[in-house]
Amino acid sequence: MKTLTQFFLFALFLCLMGSCGTAKLATNSYSPAPIQENQDYLTKSLFNSKDKTISEEGIAQILDSEIKLPDTIRLAILNYASNSINRYYSAYWSNEEFLKLQQSFIEIFKKKLSVNSKVKQIILMPKLMIGTNPNILTLRESAVRLQADLFLVFSVNSDIYYKYKAFKKDEAKAYATAEALLMDVRTGIIPFSDIVTRENQVTKDNMIDLSSQDTQKRAENGAIQLTLEELSTRVNDFLKEDK
């Protein structure tokens, strides 16, 4: 009887061992499903245009979402001009030199961004579209009317310091600060913004400067060009890096 009991206990032990081995084998053969990367992209605006606010839920969704830019981009550009640049231009809205200067600012961005493989089309936004007191919402609506995917707004401010010297040529030093924001028109989100400041110092050249005012303009225009060259490069780099 004792031998029979020992036999049953031994058989029971083998069954338990077999069950554990089977369970362990099943556990080892289990392969968890791969973790999916978050693909939650924001596809529409969550801003309420009526009261210019956004709900708490909208804030959370925006902060938890990503912006997916198109592979090919229609880019609208607006020069949100500052009055600081017109100090040397009488009746500046009709002054040919001033208008050419403003156009040259836009050309810096056009030249830099037109060679970007993602930029399909560059659209210049006319000033008459934005009115006298534009805000971020009305600017977005203007970009929609141009069917732009992205909207680049830039502005330039500058100041000049002039030194009169008794026995040397006069000098002019100018500082320019350029600001830019890039808006995703579909969502109203601004994925890129930057501020660049540069300085430029020149000495009065009697061959080309008829007055000290010409020297100051030359210094100012040089500083502005430096800021816009750098700023346009940063915008271009952002568009290249975006996936």
Specify the residue positions occupied by each region the protein language model found.
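N-terminal segment of the mature soluble domain
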Residues: 70-153
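A short acidic (Asp/Glu
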Residues: 88, 163-167, 239
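Surface-exposed short loop/turn segments
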Residues: 132-191
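C-terminal motif of bacterial Sec signal peptides marking the signal peptidase cleavage site
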Residues: 16-19
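Solvent-exposed, acidic/flexible segments
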Residues: 98-102, 132, 136, 171-173, ...
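Structured segments of extracytoplasmic/periplasmic soluble domains
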Residues: 112-116, 142-146, 157, 230-242
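Bacterial N-terminal signal peptides that target proteins for export
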Residues: 1-8
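C-terminal/domain-edge helix-coil "capping" segments
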Residues: 21-69, 185-194, 200-243
